[in-house]
Amino acid sequence: MKGKDDEGRRKKQEIYLMATIELTHLIEAGAHFGHLTRRWNPKMKPYIFMEKNGIHIIDLKKSLGLLNQAYQEMVEAVSQGGSILFVGTKKQAKGVIESEAKRCGMNWVSERWLGGMLTNFSTIRKSVKRLQNIEKQETDGTFEKITKKERLFLTRERDKLKKILEGVETMSKLPGAIFVVDIKKEDIAVKEAKRLNIPVFAMVDTNCAPDDISYVIPANDDAVKTIELIIKYMADAVIEGQAKFKERRAEEVADRERARKEHHEESEQSEEKKVSKKHLKRKDRKEDDISEEKKDSDHKEPSSES
């Protein structure tokens, strides 16, 4: 039994230590290269290490610390049952945004951010239902009953909606947080999240203002290798959070089952006590009856002798 417990603990540790990033990984990915110095945003000064050949170099020691902090915060958010929306529509990010969001079972936006995707969520859900309705018509025989022109119109509408909404088709409620690549390009997404008090995790380059970002990850947001490295790390954080969420749920179920059993045992013991009391009362009554009968008998015997 002890061996099984040790094995279970080892497996949990493997899950929780599955993702690590070191300074060398960030350097190899080119995460330290910022923008030209003339394009910098002064608000990023705390995260800049130096200037070299007209380019700002990001302080990767700070980046690593903030990246690990963001990782832990994302684990915590997901472990509480929260969901993450991954956002990255630039060419360098869209492929890995989609693949990593799928890997960790989260929603994503990799084509175009529709205005109101968060702040006007009910309208977005209507568009999703429209897409699902067209897809249903394709399979239920409706397409066979309409004209070729109508079919062409619906097919084009479906393709357009699918391209934009595919990543959020299963998003039935607002996300618990969003992860963004390039906050300058995705400024509408950031503004909508801020308006709704939704935490924002983001890769922030030297040409951006980090004011509206809850968890800043200073890094080169144009290099494919850097984007891939950080997004995969955040997806690992989601997976770790999901494992902790499942573990917590399992513990809650076990606690409820244990409480139910204890309550059942207490009820049985209480019932046994009641039965025992009834039995004792009956026994006492029987003894009283016997005693009374004996008294009556003793009282009658002398009179019969006289």
Which residues make up each language-model segment?
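Ribosome large-subunit tunnel/peptidyl-transferase-proximal elements
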Residues: 16-249
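Intrinsically disordered, compositionally biased charged tails
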Residues: 1-20, 240-306
